[in-house]
């Protein structure tokens, strides 16, 4: 990615009414200038003229029962593949078979990452969301000694216009894990414990070959 240009395209379909809301089909595609696009992801964006109140939420005390002993710098050096700008996990508060709790930094402004951004501020915070998926990778590594990549999300709902600038606490509640798949939900809250957003029905694929792709030095162990 550092030496080759990659073209990313965003597509939006026709507006459709669904009850009291409107929906738009969206796609993220990548490819070359030849027009041979690859569809990376699809979703339905639900449009509304108002925010809905955040639901009440309190995670189980069992979620914070297990300590996480690895150093964050070591985590990024030894397990995760993310570069410096995406290293947003500040502290992993706890990790157990039930899930993980972590403090996550907010992303810098769009102009720090995009040469000509469409907005001056983020709506959904890209660094926070990516770090949530990083948490899932680390949790899978603790439980199954292998890593994962996201494959599906049922829904994402945000309860305010933007994420707090001072970061959030993210709770990953794992609902299922096998040798090949994990499922769970994410809850994002501010420093006062108020819910900022929820991501429901997260699914990831586990595969030992991914660790070799993340960290080439592990290829010798194949």
Map each language-model feature to its residues:
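Acyl-thioester-processing domains in fatty-acid/polyketide/NRPS systems
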Residues: 1-222
């Amino acid at each position: 990615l550092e030496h080759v240009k990659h073209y990313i395209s965003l597509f939006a379909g026709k507006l459709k009414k669904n009850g009291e809301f409107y929906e738009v089909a969206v796609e993220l595609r990548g490819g070359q200038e030849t027009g041979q696009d690859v569809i990376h992801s699809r979703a339905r964006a639900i449009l509304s003229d108002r925010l809905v109140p955040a639901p009440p939420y309190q995670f189980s005390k069992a979620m914070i029962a297990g300590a996480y002993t690895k150093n964050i710098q070591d985590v990024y050096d030894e397990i995760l593949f993310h570069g410096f700008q995406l290293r947003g996990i500040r502290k992993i508060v706890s990790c157990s078979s039930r899930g993980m709790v972590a403090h996550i930094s907010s992303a810098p402004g769009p102009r720090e990452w995009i040469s000509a951004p469409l907005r001056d501020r983020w709506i959904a915070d890209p660094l926070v969301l990516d770090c949530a998926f990083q948490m899932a990778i680390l949790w899978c590594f603790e439980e199954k000694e292998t890593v994962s990549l996201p494959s599906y999300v049922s829904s994402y709902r945000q309860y305010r216009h933007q994420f707090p600038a001072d970061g959030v606490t993210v709770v990953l509640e794992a609902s299922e894990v096998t040798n090949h798949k994990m499922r769970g939900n994410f809850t994002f809250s501010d420093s006062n414990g108020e819910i900022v957003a929820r991501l429901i029905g997260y699914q990831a694929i586990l595969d030992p070959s991914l660790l070799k792709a993340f960290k080439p030095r592990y290829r010798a162990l194949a």
